[in-house]
């Protein structure tokens, strides 16, 4: 019985130490989440303004494209025009490691479902992985990666992802693939995220009718077409970067939730072990008393 008591005490002490670690990790993830949410909100202000300018610039082209009535005097930007799809590009965003609950598995499972349902052969798509978990997952299944990016910081700057988002945009312009999607978990709140597959190229999220609702008037120098040639790739890059920031926020939320769950589970285990310890201790005391009483009776 004594050995059992010591074993339970050791397990209680070990679980308490683990609980302290998971609680600290929960607090760190909560801090990262707060910073990521603030960064995401700031970026959204910038993204909305860029979108407003791009919508204003592309209103005429978008209306012509929508009505299937192109004009000979306008050089339509290739990033706005859908073309026959021979190959599809995917950017898949995961975490670099674990301790984030089902965050990674959710993204990878649903991405694989898309690949299996929409494509007959790996030759039909191009994969780009952001995050070590996703990169290792695809390599283990023999899926070639056009590019991979690991060890992204907790609050990624545009400079960190400039190469990969610029490369993805250039690959589309060079017709390496004919459409580009980003697969990631969208942050809703600290407890909830939602898997998303968003089409980034060709650019399809602009509504020409919105151009009439803007109060600003713009004077362009040089021409609209020349400005769009520079601005549209930057806009596409900002869309991809926005998805990366959103995914990173969801990752921190998943990490915080996973560590909170681990801490709560540790507390439950400690409570159960404490009850077991008290019962074992009570049993040991009862047995000792019984033995003393029996010994005293034998002496009488």
From Swiss-Prot:
Entry's localization field: Cell membrane
GO cellular component, one term: plasma membrane
GO BP, sorted A to Z: proton motive force-driven plasma membrane ATP synthesis
Keywords of the record: ATP synthesis, Cell membrane, CF(1), Hydrogen ion transport, Ion transport, Membrane, Transport
GO molecular function terms attached to this record: ATP binding; proton-transporting ATP synthase activity, rotational mechanism
Chief place where the protein resides: membrane
Gene3D superfamilies according to UniProt: 3.40.1380.10, ATP synthase, gamma subunit, helix hairpin domain
Annotated membrane topology: Peripheral membrane protein
Taxonomy, superkingdom: Bacteria
Protein family: Belongs to the ATPase gamma chain family.
Role according to the record: Produces ATP from ADP in the presence of a proton gradient across the membrane. The gamma chain is believed to be important in regulating ATPase activity and the flow of protons through the CF(0) complex.
PANTHER family: ATP SYNTHASE GAMMA CHAIN (PTHR11693), ATP SYNTHASE SUBUNIT GAMMA, MITOCHONDRIAL (PTHR11693:SF22)
Subunit structure: F-type ATPases have 2 components, CF(1) - the catalytic core - and CF(0) - the membrane proton channel. CF(1) has five subunits: alpha(3), beta(3), gamma(1), delta(1), epsilon(1). CF(0) has three main subunits: a, b and c.
Name assigned to this protein: ATP synthase gamma chain
Species in which this protein is naturally found: Enterococcus hirae (strain ATCC 9790 / DSM 20160 / JCM 8729 / LMG 6399 / NBRC 3181 / NCIMB 6459 / NCDO 1258 / NCTC 12367 / WDCM 00089 / R)
This protein's encoding gene: atpG
